[in-house]
């Protein structure tokens, strides 16, 4: 068969999925030490930095899946928009990646928080667009093709948008870490400690649903069952 455009895209898609799922698992485990009051603040901050280092790979993975998926969808014939549309998708995705990576490098600064807010605004626009497009397609109104063995693409887009919603809430939680650790750096603060534990407990509950949804995205992409 040789090396084809579709084969390369599938390879990149697999890598993105691996870093997405693996990265989220790494953050999940590392975050436990962030709220451990028995550790020194320096040690807890070190674990928080480790979580950020792992999380950026997951963020790169989840963003990369969008242009890769749309590109492969065109080659598979389940989404009809190629040419300039795909170019625009790739350009916008690269811009989104640049924004996300910049927020990572400027983390724990006011500039980093502002960049993170812009990253969140992108999701606020993208999520409803994807939800509407996927549901509309499943109902037969487009923009994606539906028919025998074609529904999987719209289902996958819908599930992907759900992961973005969950991921957005997890972003809120990680952004809150930065604010709370600024407070804790000034000295012991029971209220900040309690809020840190509360937000992390919520994040861990969300993580279980997150992994199930990610696995479902992978299932429909791999099996194309409907």
Cite the ranges covered by each PLM segment.
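Polytopic transmembrane helical bundles with strong interfacial aromatic enrichment
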Residues: 2-226
């Amino acid at each position: 068969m040789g090396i084809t455009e579709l084969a390369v895209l599938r390879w990149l898609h697999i890598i993105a999925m691996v870093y997405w799922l693996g990265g989220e698992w790494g953050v999940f485990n590392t975050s436990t030490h962030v709220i451990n009051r028995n550790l020194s603040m320096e040690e807890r901050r070190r674990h928080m930095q480790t979580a950020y280092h792992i999380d950026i790979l997951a963020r790169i993975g989840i963003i990369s899946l969008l242009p890769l998926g749309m590109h492969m969808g065109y080659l598979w014939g389940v989404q009809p928009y190629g040419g300039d549309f795909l170019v625009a998708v790739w350009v916008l995705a690269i811009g989104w990646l640049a924004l996300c990576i910049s927020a990572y490098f400027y983390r724990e600064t006011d500039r980093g928080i502002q960049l993170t807010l812009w990253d969140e605004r992108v999701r606020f626009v993208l999520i409803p667009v994807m939800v509407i497009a996927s549901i509309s397609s499943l109902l037969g109104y487009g923009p994606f093709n539906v028919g025998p063995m074609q529904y999987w693409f719209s289902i996958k887009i819908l599930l992907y948008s759900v992961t973005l919603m969950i991921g957005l809430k997890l972003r809120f939680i990680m952004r809150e870490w930065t604010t709370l650790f600024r407070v804790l750096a000034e000295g012991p603060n029971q209220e900040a400690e309690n809020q840190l534990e509360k937000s992390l407990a919520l994040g861990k509950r969300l993580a279980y649903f997150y992994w199930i949804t990610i696995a479902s995205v992978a299932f429909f992409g791999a099996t194309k069952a409907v």
